[in-house]
Amino acid sequence: MDPAMQAPLRIAMVAGEASGDMLAALLIGGLQADWPGIELCGIGGPEMARRGFTPWWPSERLAVHGYSMQMLRRLRELLGIRRQLRRRLLAHRPALFIGIDAPDFNLGLEADLRAAGVKTVHFVCPSIWAWRAHRVGQIRRSADHVLCIFPFEPALLAQHGIAATYVGHPLAALIALQPDRAAARAQLGLRADDEVLAILPGSRASEIEYLARPFFQAAALLRQTRPALKLLVPAVLPLRERIVQAAQAAGMGEQVQIIAGQSHTVLAACDATLIASGTATLEAALFKRPMVIAYRMHPLNWSLMRRQQLQPWVGLPNILCREFVVPELLQDAATPQALCAATQHWLDARRQHPPTITALERRFTALHHSLQRNTPQLAADALRTILAH
């Protein structure tokens, strides 16, 4: 029997941020089904730990990325963690290393491990189709294989000599094709005829800093003509106080309902959402909800991103649909007045022109079907093939 197929199999993983923790947890489920007694270690979050993963460092230590000022300030710490992790992995070599997203941290580590003979897999293709196309060379050096969550990515990577497998998007399996709005509203204490706006200003402190206040200012403008509009804000505990402060600064402290977590319940219950660009926009699309996508950042970050942007869209629903199916308001365009007007369009359409909403829901349902696969099993199948060679 191939030694790599014998238990206990040892696999090292690195996941950054909550989204990486969720993706890795699904992957662990598939691995454990195929290899009982598998040993899993590295950098991970609470969902991974609940499934038997041994975290040497918590994933929140990596929770900065891109060209952010936070990353520049913390570069020494991140490089130190990566050096320690590399030494540990080379001293106690795993059968396989899997980097989950976090390309700024993982690709360099993967390259070093691969050069030393450790098989490497990168889960979630870096968005070379959106910006930073030069990164494709780094992916080719770093990963023996890439597990892709969007259907067009394997063919793109194949053009550059990179082996890849489409495993579907885990969120598409997690979210029902027909979300139960009535159940979600009942859970949140809402009436069937309530008009509900979900406000999601981001999952990182930097996003809250730039987006929360204009989002709440837009909500205040909406309430001037829609005084009964319900405003729901799902918030993870570490960001709750920042969100409360932003709401108070906009004079909306008593008018918004801040809910601990439950972003999926809020998206299922709402009529529309005002939302920060990121994975949450795909979640909103999978819940078939009209949205206004917005983003603001430090001017230096904005300048760097615009210089390397390859597509006219920023929001994932628009990128995947290849057109502006929902509006995007970015940087200086994301004013309270513009956010209010774009959101009002969707709220008015739901009550005054339902076919507009129906057409959007059909588009998002087709997108949902294209992303829905048995991700844990497909990923485990790909890893089995990699380990056997």
Swiss-Prot record:
Read off the SUPFAM superfamilies from this record.
UDP-Glycosyltransferase/glycogen phosphorylase (SSF53756)
Please give the pathway this protein is involved in: Bacterial outer membrane biogenesis; LPS lipid A biosynthesis
Keywords in alphabetical order, please. Glycosyltransferase, Lipid A biosynthesis, Lipid biosynthesis, Lipid metabolism, Transferase
Q: Does the keyword Lipid biosynthesis apply?
A: yes
Catalysis: reaction(s): a lipid X + a UDP-2-N,3-O-bis[(3R)-3-hydroxyacyl]-alpha-D-glucosamine = a lipid A disaccharide + UDP + H(+)
Q: Name one Pfam family in it.
A: LpxB
**EC number from the UniProt entry:** 2.4.1.182
- Which cellular component, as a GO term, is one annotated location? membrane
Q: Does the keyword Thylakoid apply?
A: no
Give the signal peptide as a residue range, or say none if absent: none
Q: Which GO terms describe its molecular function?
A: lipid-A-disaccharide synthase activity; phospholipid binding
- Family assignment from sequence similarity: Belongs to the LpxB family.
Q: Which NCBIfam families match?
A: lpxB (TIGR00215)
Q: What is this protein called?
A: Lipid-A-disaccharide synthase
